[in-house]
């Protein structure tokens, strides 16, 4: 644990913490096989349905007492109070003095939401209408390129929240996409990304969305300037830029200097965090892909989960339950990571999206009061599509030495007519959660294999089981259920942050590396040997220079 002032008002100081520690000691050796064998109603008591989402959390190392104590932890952490502060627009992002109002972006009730005394809903609704109108022009063939050709390809240039969220949603909703429009996403400042993407496109039929709040983000603007140069190499006239580039930004001067018409700048606000911004104008690529009506369905799904989260009792609250289970394993069992395992090809980018949403939010070691915490906080989030994962890393989940709780996610109704494929997928989804929970004892292994007790190979085929998992079943992957699913995880992250006494909505951890990169960049091509860093960094910079632009004496 880090040194420093560890006096904290967080998790470890709450009265229920000791009760949970004692309860964990009693639960440490309890196997879930016993819990299921002695309680035929376990699924009914530890499952919850909200709209078209079903959460089965019965395959967790919990009892009613566990959940009662964890809910008490949420109460002592004032989760309900912090939840209300967020929804009403209080500035709960204390380090940046900002409200946290991604929920306002999908507030389909249109109830007033005030920031600094102003209802933000009229501006939110106006931007949504502008996005829809623009998208319908492009989709309907009214908006065309400089040569009069239809737009066939849309390239979103952004990074972080301006990339991961929209890309994940566009990919997830591919069955709803416009048949003419292909969506592309460029984020990496590695030149291979932008070069390979643009090589396959035609400047006359390509529309670019440049997503940067300040219009100064280095990676995004480097790619945007390259894209503009690529475009002008064919189009010639800089005036044509306005037909092929739009912006999601708040910096009107920089946008117009780039050549984009200010009328084609879509704004968002400082109370929208990057990793929670897909609901805002950052989601313009989503609207272009699936249309305004489907985008509204996405917002409505998120709003349904928002309403559930805001009003349901903590014990019957889906995001709260997921968060409490995360706290249980992270802070009492010592689990350091959590796997996201979607059994749906269209959700294959969900793990990467949640990596940012969760780890950038709760990857903090200093609490709201500026004190270094004395307890573990954010989990390592990782994962992959389920079937592929089974043939890659599930070995460690089943027979490894680490506890790795997992979320299994599946759609009951597929988008394809390949029912046999889907039946196999569902069977594997169900089998994995059962195998992780129940395992296979030595006696069961001997019986199944027909081997003698002295056979040394038997132990290698024993499965301890008792590995926790949640199962999340969507009736079908639609814009509505996807909105619900994303909001479910957003609120889970919020609740965990409250219990850990963290500000989940800043990200100072990304700043230091960017500052140092700004210092190193000119040194890569300087004349004199570099000596202003540590020995390792100096040597690496000088090695790079020798390999790329040899300088005598380096």
Curated annotation (Swiss-Prot):
What keywords tag this UniProt record? Cytoplasm, Gluconeogenesis, Glycolysis, Isomerase
Note whether Acyltransferase occurs among the keywords. Answer: no
A Gene Ontology cellular-component term: cytosol
Task: Output the Gene Ontology terms for molecular function.
Answer: carbohydrate derivative binding; glucose-6-phosphate isomerase activity; monosaccharide binding
Q: Tell me which EC number(s) this protein carries.
A: 5.3.1.9
Q: Which GO terms describe its biological process?
A: gluconeogenesis; glucose 6-phosphate metabolic process; glycolytic process
The record describes the protein's role as: Catalyzes the reversible isomerization of glucose-6-phosphate to fructose-6-phosphate.
Give the UniProt family note.
Answer: Belongs to the GPI family.
Listed name of the protein: Glucose-6-phosphate isomerase 2
**Species whose genome carries this gene:** Thiobacillus denitrificans (strain ATCC 25259 / T1)
The organism that produces this protein has a lineage beginning with: Bacteria, Pseudomonadati, Pseudomonadota, Betaproteobacteria, Nitrosomonadales
């Amino acid at each position: 644990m880090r040194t420093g002032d560890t006096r904290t008002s967080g998790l470890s100081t709450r009265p229920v913490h000791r009760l949970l520690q004692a309860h964990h000691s009693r639960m440490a050796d309890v196997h879930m096989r016993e819990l299921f064998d002695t309680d035929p109603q376990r699924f009914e008591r530890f499952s919850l349905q909200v709209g078209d989402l079903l959460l089965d959390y019965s395959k967790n190392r919990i009892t009613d007492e566990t959940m009662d104590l964890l809910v008490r932890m949420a109460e002592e952490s004032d989760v309900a109070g912090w939840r209300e502060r967020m929804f009403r627009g209080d500035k709960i992002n204390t380090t940046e003095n900002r409200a946290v109002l991604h929920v306002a972006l999908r507030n389909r009730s249109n109830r007033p939401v005030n920031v600094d005394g102003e209802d933000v809903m009229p501006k939110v609704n106006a931007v949504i209408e502008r996005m829809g109108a623009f998208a319908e022009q492009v989709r309907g063939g009214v908006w065309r390129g400089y040569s009069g050709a239809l737009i066939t390809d849309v390239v979103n240039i952004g990074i972080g929240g301006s990339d991961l969220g929209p890309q994940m949603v566009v990919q997830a909703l591919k069955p709803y996409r416009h048949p003419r429009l292909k969506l592309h996403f460029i984020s990496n400042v590695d030149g291979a990304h932008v070069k390979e993407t643009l090589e396959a496109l035609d400047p006359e039929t390509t529309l670019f969305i440049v997503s940067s709040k300040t219009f100064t983000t280095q990676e995004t603007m480097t790619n945007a300037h390259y894209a503009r140069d690529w475009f002008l190499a064919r189009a010639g006239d800089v005036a044509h830029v306005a037909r092929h580039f739009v912006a999601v930004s708040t910096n009107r001067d920089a946008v117009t200097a780039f050549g984009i018409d200010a009328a084609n700048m879509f704004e968002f606000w400082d109370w929208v965090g990057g990793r929670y911004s897909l609901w805002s104008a950052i989601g313009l690529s989503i609207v272009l892909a699936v249309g305004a009506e489907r985008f509204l369905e996405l917002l409505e799904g998120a709003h349904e989960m928002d309403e559930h989260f805001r009003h349901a009792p903590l014990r019957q609250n889906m995001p709260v339950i997921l968060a409490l289970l995360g706290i249980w394993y992270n802070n009492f069992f010592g689990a350091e990571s959590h796997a996201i395992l979607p059994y749906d090809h269209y959700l294959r980018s969900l793990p990467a999206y949640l990596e940012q949403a969760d780890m950038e939010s709760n990857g903090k070691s200093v609490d709201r009061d500026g004190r270094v915490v004395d307890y573990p906080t954010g989990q390592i989030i990782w994962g992959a599509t389920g079937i592929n994962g089974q043939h890659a890393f599930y070995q460690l989940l089943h027979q490894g030495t680490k506890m790795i709780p997992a979320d299994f996610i599946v759609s009951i109704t597929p988008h394809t007519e390949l029912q046999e494929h889907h039946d196999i997928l569902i069977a594997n989804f169900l089998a994995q959660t059962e195998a992780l929970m129940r395992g296979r004892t030595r006696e069961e292994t001997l019986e199944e294999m027909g081997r003698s007790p002295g056979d040394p190979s038997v132990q290698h085929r024993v499965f301890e089981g008792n590995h926790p998992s949640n199962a999340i079943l969507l009736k079908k992957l639609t814009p509505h259920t996807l909105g619900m699913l994303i909001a479910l995880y957003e609120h889970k992250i919020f609740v965990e942050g409250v219990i850990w006494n963290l500000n989940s909505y800043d990200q100072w951890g990304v700043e230091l590396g960017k500052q140092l990169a700004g210092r190193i960049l000119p040194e890569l091509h300087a004349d004199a040997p570099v000596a202003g860093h540590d020995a390792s960094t100096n040597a690496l910079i000088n090695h790079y220079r020798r390999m790329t632009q040899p300088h005598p004496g380096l």
